[in-house]
Swiss-Prot record:
Pfam families referenced in this protein's UniProt entry, alphabetically: IGPS
Protein name: Indole-3-glycerol phosphate synthase
Keywords for the protein's UniProt record, in alphabetical order: Amino-acid biosynthesis, Aromatic amino acid biosynthesis, Decarboxylase, Lyase, Tryptophan biosynthesis
Lineage, highest ranks first: Bacteria, Pseudomonadati, Pseudomonadota, Gammaproteobacteria, Pseudomonadales
Originating organism: Pseudomonas syringae pv. tomato (strain ATCC BAA-871 / DC3000)
GO MF: indole-3-glycerol-phosphate synthase activity; phosphoribosylanthranilate isomerase activity
């Protein structure tokens, strides 16, 4: 019997978590919350509009921990971090809500969204329509669909539910096979390329560059993982990739928003009164 991978463990735990949540809050109750929720902020449009200007469209991540790195940020105040990111020039936010493996929380998403006016993606392992409706009820503007965690039928179903409740979809791929499946199954405008190898956990920006020619020009490509310095940013920009999802580089900085500005907008003066998060 083979040993389960980290992803398999996460997905098994996620199924248990969803069952427990359903027992507390029904799908019908979530749908009622969605009916009373604020209008979505337009996650995809915010990125697309920035990319059209050939300006960095940064999805700044709010992440406390990960299975591979452990705790990344001890002093973790999602609202302050969100304000710091907005002051630093972020286009959107990504908030981890997985509890068991990333020490995330639904409350972190709500705190971050309430603290700024940026669109927010719920970063979690989405495997059930219940989670999609739940994401909208929490105030998310977009969900993440990870191709390696889903079959094509699941992907299509989750995307349809997202569309029905007004959420954008960012589909995440790691290799050519996953990209082919995503393009065949989904019409989302947002294609995220995760530069982290799921088997070795090594990170290479070449993953984005290798897949780029295979992605239709009408899709917006988001490069994920491995952006740590100006050279990384410039490498992407000279290849016409202007959207970035960055977490760890910001989370390890004393002032996440200032680090965002240093990496992506070095020509700007520091934001006046931008909150220090230390």
């Amino acid at each position: 019997m083979s040993v389960p991978t980290v992803l398999e463990k996460i997905l098994a735990r996620k199924a248990e978590e969803i069952a427990a949540r359903r027992a507390v809050v029904s799908l019908a109750e979530l749908e009622q919350q969605v009916a009373n929720a604020d209008a979505p902020r337009g996650f995809a449009n915010a990125l697309i509009n920035q990319v059209r200007l050939k300006q960095p469209a940064v999805i700044a991540e709010i992440k406390k921990a990960s299975p591979s790195k452990g705790v990344i940020r001890e002093n973790f105040l999602p609202g302050e971090i969100a304000r710091s990111y907005q002051a630093g020039g972020a286009t959107c936010l990504s908030v981890l809500t997985d509890v068991d493996f990333f020490q995330g929380s639904d409350a972190y998403l709500q705190e971050a969204r309430a603290a700024c006016n940026l669109p927010v993606i719920r970063k979690d392992f989405m495997i059930d329509p219940y989670q999609v409706v739940e994401a909208r009820a929490l105030g998310a503007d977009c969900i993440l669909l990870i191709v390696s965690a889903l079959d094509d039928v699941q992907m299509a179903e989750l995307a349809a539910v997202a569309k029905g409740v007004g959420l954008d979809v960012l589909v995440e791929v790691h290799d050519g096979d996953e990209l082919e499946r995503a393009l065949k199954t989904l019409d989302t405008k947002l294609v995220g390329v995760n530069n982290r190898n799921l088997h070795t956990f090594e990170v290479s920006l070449e993953t984005t560059l290798d897949l780029l020619p295979r992605i239709p020009r009408d899709r917006t490509v988001i490069t994920e993982s491995g952006i740590f310095n100006r050279a990384d940013v410039e490498l992407m920009e000279i290849n016409d990739v202007y959207s970035f999802l960055v977490g760890e580089a910001f989370m390890r900085a004393e002032q996440p928003g200032a680090e965002l500005q240093r990496l992506f907008f070095p020509e700007r003066k520091p934001a006046a009164g931008g909150p220090a998060v230390d």
